[in-house]
Amino acid sequence: MGNTKALIVGISKYFLSGANDLLFCKNDAIAIRTAFIHGLAVAPENIITCGLTDIVTIDDFMTSLRDFEKITQDDDTLLFYFSGHGTTIDSNHYLVLSDKLISTQEIIAYLDAIPAKNKVVFLDCCLAGNFQVGGSAILDVESTASNF
């Protein structure tokens, strides 16, 4: 039986024009790490936390993502949590890092290529529903709400 592994990203400080600093994303990352450890019994050594200095550059993020991939086994469950700015440009969703945008679709594709049994993505950012995951059902919110 596999283990649960987590990559947690919390970005509070931004250098990009139009991206205001967010006061509590680092706190979100710390709180979700605690929740994963105590609520889901994720071993602390199986958690990579990126953003404890408030800043996550593209280099920091990609290094953490590659490290996350290296610790993953085929039967593991992966948890990816992001707290920070999100934006949409030309109908494409991006996560806003401290120094650069990164396509949410690219991150999903990267995570999808990691051979793990289960993958869960948590996006705590604006416009977080504006991307697609292959093989997932399209949700009709109004129909679901009326049937509820």
Q: Across the structure, where does each feature detected by a protein language model lie?
A:
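Boundary/activation segment at the start of structured domains
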Residues: 1-94
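Cysteine protease catalytic core and zymogen-processing segment of caspase-like enzymes
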Residues: 24-29, 33, 87-148
